[in-house]
Amino acid sequence: MKGIKALVLMAVAVCASLVAQAQGNNGLKYVNALELQIINKGFEDTYSPYSRLPLKVEETIKTLDGRGALLDRGRNSAGIGIRFSSNSARIGVRYNLVVDFHMVHMADTGIKGTDLYILNDEGVWEYVNTNRPIKDSIQHKIYADALPTDRMREYIIYLPLYDGVNWLEVGVDSSAVISKPIVNNPRKEKKVIFYGTSILQGGCATRTGMVATNMVQRDLNVECVNLGFSGEGKMDMFMAEAMASIPEAVAYVLDPIPNCTKDMCTNLTYDFVKKIREERPDVPIIMVEGPMYSYTKYDRFTKNYLAEKNAEWRKNYEKLKADNPKNLYYVTAEGLSGNDNEGTVDGIHFTDMGFRAYADKLIKVLKKLVK
């Protein structure tokens, strides 16, 4: 099976190379991203290098009726980044999308674009540019042509949030050097594991660097594994088991309430969280309430129902806390998308402002837990 998969991947790479040559390379030399460093990924044994679920979980999902969407979302590359060092004045990218997905309420730059960041002289990750997806089999972009060349610099390319990539290459000037990162930032030995829904996956950031998990990664210098799955954050026990198996985990952030019914919040929460606690008793767990969407101020049923779900979530937190008060934390819904009702694109899914507010609220808790 592994031999067949290797042959298929080799064939894809050869075809990609031929297509890229036909398009021209803009004077850049391109390196397969697999020769660099993949960050913000929780599992090695995945369907592709740029997908998020372990094969064991994929096989479990295939046995379940009506859960195909979780399989699809798991093959989106949300949160994953490519880390490398280079002294090139120009940096480019080219890649092939899995789906070429589109949504009416989210920018294509967030769905299937890529962002380039540089680690500046102050040690802060600084945004450089975004590639705007085009109607072509190969996405390509030269992000910049005047990057500093005085020494090797550190870079991240963030991958699509609501699509996946079959392959990706990073381009640099023909005389430049490109290598695996020299600086350990984010720290690969520390991973914060985020689990949740479409919002956590990145709906609806305008570009890939603006999802909350990538903000936390840059601000706290730790890898952040994005296990947000649109419509599918339903506290499946196999997900708790998978998350508990990640050896580098230094904190878990659990945010599934938007995808759960009140009954699910009542009946699944305790066992789901308990499973992670049993497997990783020394790793902090942060339980995040579901956001009180801005439109609910004027929608009586939804306002009451969301409050009821959060109340059940809170009851289970108190029960778990009574069992063992250590390493369990709670974040309320207040201010999750900001405090002015302007943090969403559709009353539910976050804008960049909403993600900044969410990240800031989580950072206040995480920075005390992640040394």
Language model: regions and residue ranges:
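Short helix-loop-beta junction
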Residues: 213-226, 318-319
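Oxyanion-hole/transition-state-stabilizing segment in secreted/luminal serine hydrolases
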Residues: 204, 208, 216, 234-279, ...
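Bacterial N-terminal signal peptides
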Residues: 8-17
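Catalytic nucleophile-elbow at a beta strand-turn-alpha helix junction centered on a G-D-S/GDSL motif
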Residues: 189-210
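Structural recognition of the beta-strand scaffold that forms the well-ordered cores
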Residues: 191-194, 223-227, 250-255, 284-288, ...
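N-terminal secretory targeting modules
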Residues: 2-3, 18-191, 367-371
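Substrate-gating cap/lid alpha-helix
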Residues: 293-331, 357
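Histidine-centered active-site loop/cap adjacent to the catalytic His
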Residues: 346-371
